[in-house]
């Protein structure tokens, strides 16, 4: 009987400990995720109008925000345009950024000459503030690149960030460079956990670097790679590819994404309300 009571006491005590342990994270999830997003959901159905007589804002419930978005020809055209740019940016990051990140991580994993310096160089953009990097990059594209092209007897009609034909490519080049820090660090750390016996056995069997990378390293790293592949889909709707850092609130149709459109509209609405 005592053993049964003691076991029941320990069970109840463990249950209260578990409840106390889970209360804080569940409360944080409820307040900072469910409540915040529920409020955003309600705001989507609210209409804010300034009363010219009382000079006060009047609020009403409506579905006009959605009906205008999908019936207004200008809004549909804007949505298509920004979605196209977002898909292009996502495709570039997926098809170019991901393979390059894996190759760079493999270079560091094999401890080839300059691997540590290479790792520092790729991770540096994650340490320095974005506005500082953008300022340096703008000076480089505005002044250094034209001088280099002059030596090669190539002239530009405008700077790389000003010309419509070069603006998107220049912005994406910057985004590719600054995206390697976190991904390369995680890829290389995952590769470092690969059993040395597996690599040594493959080398004894005559596997070359190409085969080792694709048939040993990639499968062993796929758990980390899959996380980036899945979460990267959200970037289609949220990534603004540093539009604000480069162009502030100046709208550039060839680089504006869905993420920047949402940010642009939000700031515009705040400005209208504050006025």
Features from the language model and the residues they span:
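Short, Lys/Arg-rich, polar N-terminal cytosolic tail immediately upstream
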Residues: 1-12
């Amino acid at each position: 009987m005592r053993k049964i009571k003691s076991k029941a006491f320990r069970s109840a005590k463990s249950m209260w400990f578990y409840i106390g342990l889970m209360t804080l994270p569940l409360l944080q999830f409820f307040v900072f995720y469910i409540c915040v997003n529920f409020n955003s959901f309600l705001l989507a159905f609210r209409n804010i109008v300034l009363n010219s007589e009382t000079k006060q804002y009047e609020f009403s419930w409506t579905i006009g925000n959605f009906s205008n978005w999908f019936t207004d020809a200008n809004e549909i055209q804007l949505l298509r345009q920004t979605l196209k740019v977002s898909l292009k940016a996502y495709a570039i990051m997926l098809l170019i950024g991901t393979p390059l990140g894996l190759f760079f991580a493999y270079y560091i994993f094999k401890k080839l000459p300059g691997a540590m310096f290479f790792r520092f160089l790729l991770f540096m953009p994650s340490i320095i503030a974005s506005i500082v990097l953008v300022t340096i990059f703008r000076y480089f594209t505005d002044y250094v690149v034209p001088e280099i092209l002059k030596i090669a007897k190539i002239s530009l009609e405008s700077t790389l960030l000003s010309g419509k034909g070069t603006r998107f490519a220049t912005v994406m080049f910057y985004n590719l460079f600054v995206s390697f820090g976190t991904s390369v660090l995680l890829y290389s750390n995952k590769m470092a956990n690969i059993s040395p016996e597996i690599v040594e056995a493959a080398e004894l069997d005559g596997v070359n670097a190409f085969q080792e990378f694709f048939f040993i390293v990639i499968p062993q790293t796929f758990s980390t790679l899959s996380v980036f592949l899945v979460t990267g889909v959200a970037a289609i709707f949220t990534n603004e590819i540093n539009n604000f850092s480069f162009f502030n609130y100046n709208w550039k149709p060839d680089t504006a994404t869905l993420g920047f459109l949402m940010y642009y509209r939000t700031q515009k609405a705040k400005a209208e309300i504050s006025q």
